[in-house]
């Protein structure tokens, strides 16, 4: 492993051993990834030693590193160095002194920290044995106090201590378990699964922001190492441990809710998890939530017809609760609202043309969502009929020169403003012109649009646009 580490880290480790007599270890993800044969690009290089933070900080500074922060309570040092190759960016590192942590049940941050020189105690403050393998940089050897290397070899996720204790200490580990399973393809042991399920309620003690961030990592789990089906594996584990019940009770209300057998092989919840798994990265969150309105619709109406509209409102509540960015919330809600549009292929072409232009900003993602939805019905990876139709029509419209944005219209707002009763009509008039030429692209000329603008403005529909 020595040959994958930068020279300046090797020199720091050798200096640490020579001056203090204590080894400097690499630990965590980079060691696990090396032993598992995963790509190391993007792996964090976390360092640790049986050494006080202040002593390590002074040592690193004397070796030419920049000290960015020292946290005495946790024994953590954040430091950086400019790479020797001038073309490279500054490299950031984190050091942690060997320690033992004490938690209030379920909280993410330890309430007490005790420093130690015992590597076993330090290993047992971590989450899974595969993340508790130490590499002695100067001596070029591994130290494996909890037999994590065997778990890496067997692709197992085993807790560093009794599973009830590990998950009971830190509720966020419940989601980290799912993320790790998705990113690595490792399988949790039965004890690990049981401990997570027993402590699932502790996820409620974790801040919404942390839950949202971990959820995104789960949704993108297959991106890290290219493990096929990683997103679905992560979400399925959240379901299996019942953590999903506390994060998305509106979604898990679909567990066991059957759908038409001629269209679906799975209940509403499983269909949603599979849709997220089949979806492209940009629409996975929308795919997870696309049918979130079905349970409410069925409960109140005995049918699913209104689920897109109900789902939009429910998705907004969920994403607001998780404090997702407003931009993400609006986009996901729009996709949920329209994911069933033209599902039966009966929408008239002119109406569909106007819809595609009016929703051009989400049209590509809407097709991706429709495809994921279709694939998740019966695990059919062929192109969805609706997607075929929309793509063919979109190509046809592009060939005809249909404008898909106001910028592509042959007139500007200041050109039609003098022709309208009031400046307040300009925006609505431009949108009306855009929808008109979606059906009549040959009329996207300045002369024709200047003629049409006041006539469209006089139309009653414009008053409500």
Functional labels for PLM-detected ranges:
Residues 1-465:
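Catalytic cores of the polymerase beta-like nucleotidyltransferase superfamily
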């Amino acid at each position: 492993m020595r040959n994958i580490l930068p020279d300046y880290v090797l020199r720091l480790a050798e200096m640490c051993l020579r001056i203090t007599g204590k080894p400097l270890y690499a630990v965590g993800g980079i060691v696990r990834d090396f032993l598992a044969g995963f790509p190391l690009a993007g792996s964090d290089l976390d360092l640790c030693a049986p050494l006080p933070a202040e002593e390590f900080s002074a040592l690193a500074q004397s070796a030419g590193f920049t000290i960015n922060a020292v946290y005495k309570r946790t024994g953590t040092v954040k430091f950086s160095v400019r790479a020797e190759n001038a073309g490279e960016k500054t490299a950031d590192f984190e050091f942690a002194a060997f320690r033992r942590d004490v938690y209030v049940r379920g909280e993410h941050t330890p309430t007490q920290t005790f420093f130690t020189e015992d590597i076993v105690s330090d290993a047992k403050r971590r989450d899974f044995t595969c993340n508790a393998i130490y590499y002695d940089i100067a001596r070029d050897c591994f130290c494996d106090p909890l037999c994590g290397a065997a778990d890496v070899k067997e692709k197992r996720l085993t807790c560093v201590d009794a599973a009830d204790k590990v998950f009971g200490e830190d509720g966020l580990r419940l989601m980290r378990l799912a993320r790790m399973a998705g990113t690595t393809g490792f399988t949790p042991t039965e004890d690990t699964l049981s401990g997570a399920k027993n402590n699932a309620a502790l996820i409620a003690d974790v801040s919404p922001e942390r839950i949202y961030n971990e959820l995104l990592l789960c949704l993108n789990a297959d991106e890290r190492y290219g493990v096929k089906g990683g997103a679905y594996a992560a979400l399925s584990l959240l379901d299996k441990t019942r953590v999903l019940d506390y994060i998305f009770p509106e979604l898990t209300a679909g567990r066991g809710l059957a759908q038409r057998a001629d269209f679906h092989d799975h209940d509403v919840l499983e269909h949603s998890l599979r849709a997220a798994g089949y979806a492209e990265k940009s629409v996975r969150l929308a795919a997870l939530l696309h049918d979130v309105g079905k349970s409410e619709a069925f409960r109140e109406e005995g049918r699913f017809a209104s689920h897109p509209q109900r789902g939009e409102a429910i998705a907004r509540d969920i994403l607001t609760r998780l404090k997702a960015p407003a931009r993400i919330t609006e986009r996901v809600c729009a996709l949920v609202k329209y994911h069933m549009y033209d599902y039966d292929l009966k929408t008239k072409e002119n109406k569909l043309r106007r819809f595609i232009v009016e929703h051009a900003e989400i049209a590509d993602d809407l097709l991706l969502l429709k495809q994921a939805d279709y694939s998740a019905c019966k695990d059919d990876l062929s192109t969805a009929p609706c997607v075929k139709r929309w793509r063919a029509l979109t190509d046809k419209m592009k060939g005809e020169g249909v404008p898909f944005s106001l910028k592509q219209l042959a007139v500007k707002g200041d050109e039609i403003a003098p022709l309208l009763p009031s400046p307040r009509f300009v925006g609505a008039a431009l949108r009306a012109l855009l929808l008109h030429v979606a059906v009549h692209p040959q009329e996207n000329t300045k002369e024709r649009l200047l003629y049409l603008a006041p006539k469209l403005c006089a139309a009653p529909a414009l008053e409500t646009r």
